[in-house]
Amino acid sequence: MLVRNLTGVGLWMLFSLLSSNAVFAQEAAPTPASPPTLQERVEALEKKSDAPSIWKTLGFKASGFLDVAYTHNFNNPSTNLNQLHIFDTNASSFMPHLAQVMLERPADASGSAAERAGFRARLNFGSDARVTRARTNYQPGVASDEMDFQELYAEYILPVGNGLKVQFGKMNTLIGYEVINSFENPNFSRTFMFGLGQAFTTTGLRLSYTFNPMITATVGVVNGWDNVDDNNKGKTFEWLVALTPHERFGASFYGSVGPEQSNTVGGVVAGGVGANASATRTVVGSILTFKATSQDTIILEPYYANEANANLVAGKGGKNARWNGLGAYLIHDIDDQWSARVRGEIFEDAGGARTCTGSVAGTVGGFTGVPGGWNTCAAQPSGNGGLVGGGGIAQTLWDTTFTLQYKPLPSLITRAEFRYDKSNKSVFLNGNDRSNNQETLSFQVIYLF
């Protein structure tokens, strides 16, 4: 009853904010000046010295951010973990999610041969880095390192037509709308579709070309999903086509195809389920963006994936596994400081290949734990009345999320978020008991520099 009341209050607050947009717009105070960024501080020192530094001469740029949050779980799970969440994994706890430092030199297509060369090094520290570390075939690891190079690549723009950009190294994936950095997403938490069904990063070679302001195409050959070290002899092909036919509408079409399984996975013998180096994973999806008004943006993301030899459902082991979903976002910018965001998602893991592969909890088998606590579930009943888990659970998941964002300064972002998760299986924990739903309330602070 408490959760329902809180949900009702949250919805009433969101409706009130949306309906009072005109009042906010008229009465909002001017945005205070933001503290200087790291790049601006460097430029100020250069002015004092009356001489350009090597930093400026080489075109280097530095930036970063700090991300901390508190998440409360109304189910009060006995494991102190939010089931099936990716980064916001600790229940009723503060988390130092990420401290990121990025050094880059963007390549300049209109510059000299030397200016056409560039690089990016993006280094992560914090609890999120335990998850963003490169993973092979999405199997849980045992290390607890809280440092990870999210991106580390060199680039060069060849003088071909409008400029052919060549990138080589570790880069954020082309797949999906959401990304690792929370402040670049509409909401604090991530979708099941991104966290459990898509790649985070890829390592390899990528080519990008802008034909005109309306069409950009990117293709790449990479080691595979989240693989710095390739886990097989095959390579994965990735692509993205971004179209902007109108200033109020954009459509991107992405995908990848290639072998993602290694010869061995844990105790699974070569050629067994999830360990066939020739099994192909195919992914396609799109991102549709509508700028309905100057203040309202709608994003839709349909997504489909299929992989051979990955099904973990009893009696179907070794067959194809399918996972697919649909994400929908509404972003309403009330003014320069306030913004309300609503997200809805459905994610189906028909083969049990993507969900609950982290660890399980229950009265039988206990709780094994995984660094970061991601992709955990309550144990499921066995045929003899006990509880079993691990190996994934075929299910359909829903996520409804309401986020209110306030930026008192351009460099300071604060968020309050209520999220409701539901499954057609009892994979969540309510205390020590299994449940088919989970509610969380989060507060986040991000400082950009």
Task: List the predicted regions and their residue ranges.
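N-terminal periplasmic/intermembrane-space "pro-region" immediately following the signal or transit peptide
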Residues: L2-I86, G372-L387, F449
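Surface-exposed coil loops of outer-membrane beta-barrel proteins
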Residues: P77-A91, D128-H246, S252-V273, A361-S382
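Outer-membrane beta-barrel pore domains and translocons
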Residues: D67-T71, R122-G126, G169-T173, G220-W225, ...
